[in-house]
A protein has these predicted regions:
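ATP/NTP phosphate-donor binding region
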Residues: 1-85
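Glycine-rich phosphate/pyrophosphate-binding beta-alpha loops
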Residues: 139, 246-279, 356-360
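Carboxylate- and glycine-rich phosphate/diphosphate-binding segment that chelates Mg2+/Mn2+
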Residues: 147-255
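Short, amphipathic C-terminal "tail helix"
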Residues: 343-382
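Short glycine/serine/threonine-rich phosphate/pyrophosphate-binding segments
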Residues: 18-21, 40-44, 68-71, 93-98, ...
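Gly/Pro-rich interdomain helix-loop hinge
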Residues: 270-345, 381
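Glycine/threonine-rich beta-strand-loop-alpha-helix active-site module
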Residues: 69-176
Length: 382
């Protein structure tokens, strides 16, 4: 057995822990860039804590998924405002943007020199500005991942900037920040976290540490996600879901993902659709295809996922597709066709998905025909 494992240098978890933010970064300097989502007012409490610690903050808002222009503009703000460190405060998009801005500040050349797929893919050699990730949703786990996803709408693709040096110095997870999130966002982001846990659990790169995280994370997400959606003001389920999302990020950063995210990358680039909803619409069909094609010795892992989801030690992998489809129905997840995907898109999506980095860790190597069949099944069910 041989594996490597890494995560953020420091993880702080707990309701109310946001108040520590000023003292955590004060030694790095007295000027910080806050990268947040569309509504900068959501960062008002964060800014108050920084003010109390004597840290001056500058806010840079990201409207949706970051693009090359987003990172370039944010980098210019860092230079113009002489910021010493960076906070990513929001969902996956804000945290990824903050991550990319922090790392690119110290690199030579342009961001395209370091991007996968459409760039030169040069390795990142220098540590970036100190970076703290603060999630306000329970979904992507970007607070503990080593990559930032950037969208290129003009090409209809998403690509990653990736390096171990991009792991945050601190991941500060305050579940109380997710209280009151709208139903749709809670459901979509939560299903993304659940998908990440399931894919990492059966990944070809899984190891004993990611196995342990996935086992507990799946149990937490299965028990708490619906309660978060239908009882949005209760802190207990929010804490469990935040922990599940954290585990999902650590697991995917060390074990990889699979075909669901392999498909989701090109679909997200080609269509304006919530990432978590795309993953949820694909998950039952990828699960079924993987289950049909795995080797007998792989079956135990799939059964253990079923046991975590159903909360039943006798559950088997064959029950998972129905369970996931039922959950998606209750959480009002739109089917793939309703998200804009049609049969005419299948060949191109499958072609792009086959090249996606997430596909490499799928437990089964599906050929082009199998990938197209999975997509067609998802569309027909829609």
């Amino acid at each position: 057995m041989h594996f490597e494992f890494s995560t953020a240098s420091r993880i702080i978890f707990g309701s109310g822990c946001l108040e520590q933010i000023g003292t955590l970064g004060r030694d790095w300097g007295r000027r910080v860039l806050i990268v947040t989502g569309r509504d900068p007012e959501r960062a008002s409490a964060l800014r108050e804590h920084l003010d109390e610690a004597g840290v001056t903050s500058v806010v840079y808002s990201v409207a949706g998924e970051p693009t090359l222009q987003t990172i370039e503009e944010g980098s210019e703000v860092v230079r113009a405002e002489a910021c010493d460190w960076v906070i990513g405060f929001g969902g996956g998009s804000a945290m990824d943007a903050g991550k990319a801005i922090a790392i690119m500040h110290t690199q030579e050349g342009e961001i395209l020199d370091y991007l996968e797929v459409i760039g030169k893919g040069r390795p990142i050699r220098r540590e970036g500005l100190p970076y703290i990730a603060v999630p306000t949703t329970s979904g992507t786990g970007a607070e503990v991942t080593r990559n930032a996803v950037l969208g290129f709408p003009e090409h209809g693709i998403k690509v990653s900037l990736r390096s171990p040096l991009m792991l945050p110095r601190v991941a500060l997870v305050d579940p109380s920040l997710t209280l009151g999130l709208p139903f749709e966002i809670t459901a979509s982001t939560g299903l993304d976290a659940l998908t990440q846990l399931i894919e990492a659990a059966v990944s070809s790169r899984a190891n004993p540490m990611t196995d342990a995280l996935c086992e507990k994370g799946i149990q937490l997400a299965a028990a708490s996600l619906e309660r978060c959606c239908f009882q949005p003001g209760e802190i207990g389920p929010r804490e469990d879901m935040a922990l599940a999302a954290l585990y999902s990020g650590i697991a995917l950063a060390n074990a990889g993902l699979g075909a669901v995210h392999g498909f989701a990358a090109p679909i997200g680039g080609m269509f304006s659709a919530p990432h978590g909803a795309v993953c949820a619409a694909l998950l039952p069909h990828v699960w079924r295809a993987n289950l049909k094609a795995i080797q007998p010795q792989q079956k135990g892992k799939f059964d253990r996922v079923a046991q975590g989801l159903l909360g039943d030690a006798s559950a088997r992998a064959e029950q998972v597709q129905d369970w996931i489809e039922g959950l998606c129905l209750r959480l009002r997840i739109r089917p793939l066709a309703a998200l804009g995907v049609s049969a005419s898109d299948v060949t191109e999506i499958a072609r792009r998905a086959a090249q996606a980095s997430s596909m490499k860790a799928n437990p089964v190597n599906h050929g082009p025909a199998a990938l197209e069949a999975i997509l067609m099944e998802a569309i027909r069910v829609s």
